[in-house]
Amino acid sequence: MENLQVIQVATGMISIPPNGWGAVERIIWAYQNRLERMGHKVDIRYLNQVNYQPNTIVHTHIANLALDCKSRGIPYVFSLHDHHSEWYGKGSFVFNQNLEAIKGSIISFTHAEHLVEYFSETDKLFYLSHGVDTEFFTPEYSSPKSGQHSLLMLANNGLAGNSGFDRKGFRFGIEAAKHLDLPITVVGTDNNLKFFEAHPDLMEYEKLSIVANNPTDEETRKLYQSHTIFLHPSMLEAGHPNLTLLEAASSCLPIVGTYKGSKEIKGLHIIKDINTNEVIEGIKKTIDDYENIWNSMYKVREEYDWMHVAQKLAYFYKYVLKVNERYDSEKTKSLYVKAYSETPRYV
C-alpha cells in the first residue's frame, strides 16, 4: 500500500498525547502511533490549522468539527464517539448533529456494532473496533488461591452532567464485592468523588478502596496487574468493546460485564441484565474456572492491538482517496464494502 497523508483533527479539549482522562484523545494518539509505524505520515492539528490538499485524508472525531469541515468545503472522515446520541435518542439535538456529520462525510466509523443499525438513516456508517497497546498493558500472573481474589472497576462515572448517575454500575460491583466478602478498588477521576457523595451508603463497605486521582498509564497498568477480576457492568458505551475492557483483556484480567458485539472477547463473562445478582454469579463462575480463563486470554491478547485496527483503517483511507475521484454513489458503496472485506475480521 502506498504511503498515506493523514490529518487527525484535535478535539481542542485535552492535549494529545493525553495527560489525563480522555478516551477520544487516546484513540487519536493510537491511530497516529500505529499508522506511522506502517510508514504513513500522520499529523494532529486543530481545525484552523488544516490546509487541505488533494490526496490528504482529514479525520474528525467530534460532530461539530465535522460540520465545520463541511462548511469549509473540506472532505472528511468522521468517527462517532458520543454515547449521548444513543442516550438522548433519535430526533434529539445530539443524535441529529451526529447524523448530519455522518451524512456529510466521505465515510464514518462507529466503535459499537449496534450503532450501525441505530443510525439507519444513513449507509455511510461502518464498524471499526477499538484496540489496545498490548506492548504496554501486559499480564503479570500468579495463580490466586481461594479467598485471595480482588476486584477492580476503572471508569469515570456519571451521565449528561449528572455525576451521581451510575452509568458504569459502581453500585452493582460494590454490592457484589460485599456479598462475596472480596476487596474492590474503584479507580477514576476526581469526578467519581461526586458520585460517592451522592451514594454515601456504598462507602460503608470496609473493603472498598477509592482511587480518584486520575491515575497515570503506569499506575493504571499496575492496577490491572495487581487485581484478579475486572468488573464492567456499564449500561451505556460508545465503544463495544470500550478501551478499559480491552486494556483488561490485554492484561489477561478476566472480566465480568456488559458487551454488545459479535466479536468474541476471551475471558469476558457477559451479564445480560445489569444487577447485583448477575455480577455476583459472573464473579463466582470466573473464580471457579480462573486458570482456564486466564490461559484462554493469554493466547489471543495480541489480536486486540491497535496495529490491527490501524491496518483496517489504512484500507478504508485508501478507498477514501478513490471516492474523492468522484465515483458515483453505488461505486462508492462497493469500495467501502471491498475495503471491509479485505481486512482482518477480528477488528
Describe each PLM feature range.
Residues Y88-G89, G131-Q148, N162, N324:
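Acidic anion/phosphate-binding donor-loop and adjacent secondary structure
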Residues K103-P139, S146, L154-N156:
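Donor nucleotide-sugar binding/catalytic pocket of nucleotide-sugar-dependent glycosyltransferases
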Residues S146-P200, D217:
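Conserved catalytic-core segment of nucleotide-activated headgroup transferases in glycan assembly
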Residues F196-R221:
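Nucleotide-activated donor-binding/catalytic signature segment of Leloir-type glycosyltransferases, i.e.
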Residues Q225-A238, L253:
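Acidic donor-binding loop of glycosyltransferase active sites
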Residues S250, P254-G257:
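Short hydrophobic beta-strand element within catalytic cores of glycosyltransferases
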Residues D288-R345:
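A charged, aromatic-enriched C-terminal amphipathic alpha-helix characteristic of glycosyltransferases
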